[in-house]
């Protein structure tokens, strides 16, 4: 084992633009490569964009177990592997704390995804380390967390809003909300991105017993706020010449909401379970006749943007978040009856499906590609490199 791998500080590597490159440390995700969710994908895509632009990018990665911090690289991104041997939110909190303490040994700019442990970021503020924080959605308001977790999130949100040099909102409505937490000059809206999918192998789709173009997809966490029951009820209200494919872990034996969804499903509803392999998920999206999106809360949802990037016609829950993301060319619902009538009208019209698909790609190209999103991050982060953050500016923010 190298000396660098045995110690907790990568002292043999240049930092703080010592080699002429701007430096950013990415915290708040499980790390790269992305294997979990939206924040991990954002960290990976933004990190790679910055790397191509000539930056040195250091990503903190959570690994199971105990021992010393180790270092390696993935596709040119430098990884700081932080071992944690606690499960769930306790492990995540410990991981965040370790990352903050490690990164605080340097003067490098930090890009932080999320505010779940925002109170810990006060240490970075004390050390006068510049921080740009992606504030996610209004997580504390989500009923799924319960009162105790909501209060923890609320407190951490307030701390992050106060100590961050700059805040990123991933949706205009989140941006407006953050204006109540920080000066407008301190908030920038940068949406979530996706890769465009122009072709995909049919084999993974057929291997699942599905016919390309003859099924709809619904990909989300199976919880009530994602309107799965309404979508399944609306689809199942009458026979259709399509399948409805659900991705996600459903356990009707132990979860009452899951049981309701399964009981409402017709024989044309297919439960595939939780699938994370992009070599399967991407073809499933691309060859889907339509994407159903029931999210009622949050900002720019990754699954919705990915559907637009695949050219999927979209039927989404009617709210301000989804309407901004998907645009005027898609369809919206509020009730199960709305779902049924919308599917009746759309699935029977190849012309409308084609128009919605074209509108989805048009919306994607209007500002949702990772190239566009990555460049917006670069321009913002460049303003907060340590050499450009004066004492006056740091104090003001």
Regions found by a protein language model. Give the residues of each.
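An aromatic- and histidine-rich active-site surface loop
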Residues: 67, 92-136, 140, 299
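Short hydrophobic beta-strand element within catalytic cores of glycosyltransferases
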Residues: 290, 309, 313-316
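Nucleotide-activated donor-binding/catalytic signature segment of Leloir-type glycosyltransferases, i.e.
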Residues: 258-279
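Membrane-proximal helix-turn-helix segments that form the acceptor-binding/catalytic region
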Residues: 101-104, 150-167
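A charged, aromatic-enriched C-terminal amphipathic alpha-helix characteristic of glycosyltransferases
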Residues: 53, 351-386
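Aromatic "clamp/platform" in nucleotide-sugar-dependent glycosyltransferases that forms part
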Residues: 295-296
């Amino acid at each position: 084992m190298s000396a660098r791998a045995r110690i907790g500080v990568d002292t043999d590597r240049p930092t703080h633009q010592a080699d002429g490159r701007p430096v950013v440390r990415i915290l708040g995700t499980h790390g790269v490569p992305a294997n979990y969710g939206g924040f991990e994908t954002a960290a990976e895509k933004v990190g790679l964009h910055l790397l191509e632009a000539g930056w040195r990018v250091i990503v903190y990665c959570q690994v199971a177990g105990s021992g010393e911090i180790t270092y390696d690289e993935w596709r040119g991104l430098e990884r700081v592997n932080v071992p944690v041997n606690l499960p769930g939110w306790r492990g995540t909190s410990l991981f965040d704390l370790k990352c903050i303490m490690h990164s605080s040994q340097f003067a490098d700019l930090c890009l932080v995804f999320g505010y779940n442990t925002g109170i810990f970021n006060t240490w970075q503020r004390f050390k006068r380390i510049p921080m740009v924080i992606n504030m996610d959605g209004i997580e504390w308001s989500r009923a799924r967390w319960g009162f105790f977790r909501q209060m923890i999130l609320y407190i951490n949100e307030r701390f992050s809003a106060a100590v961050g040099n700059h805040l990123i909102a991933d949706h205009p409505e989140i941006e407006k909300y953050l204006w109540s937490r920080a000066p407008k000059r301190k908030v920038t809206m940068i949406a979530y991105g996706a890769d465009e999918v122009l072709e995909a192998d049919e084999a993974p789709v057929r291997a699942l017993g599905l016919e390309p173009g003859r099924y709809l997809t619904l990909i989300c966490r199976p919880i009530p706020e994602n309107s799965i029951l309404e979508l399944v009820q609306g689809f199942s209200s009458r026979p259709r010449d399509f399948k409805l494919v659900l991705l996600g872990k459903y356990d009707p034996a132990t979860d009452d909401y899951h049981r309701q969804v399964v009981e409402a499903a017709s024989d044309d509803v297919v439960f595939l379970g939780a699938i994370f392999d992009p070599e399967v998920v991407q073809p499933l999206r691309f060859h889907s006749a339509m994407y159903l999106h029931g999210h009622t809360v949050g900002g720019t949802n990754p699954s919705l943007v990915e559907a637009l990037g695949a050219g999927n016609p979209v039927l989404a829950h009617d709210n301000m978040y989804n309407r901004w993301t998907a645009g005027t060319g898609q369809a919206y619902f509020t009730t199960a009856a709305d779902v049924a009538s919308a599917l009746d009208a759309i699935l029977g019209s190849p012309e409308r499906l084609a128009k919605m698909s074209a509108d989805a790609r048009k919306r994607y190209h209007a500002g949702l590609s990772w190239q566009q999103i990555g460049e917006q991050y670069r321009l913002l982060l460049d303003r907060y490199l340590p050499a450009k953050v004066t004492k006056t500016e740091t104090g003001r923010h």
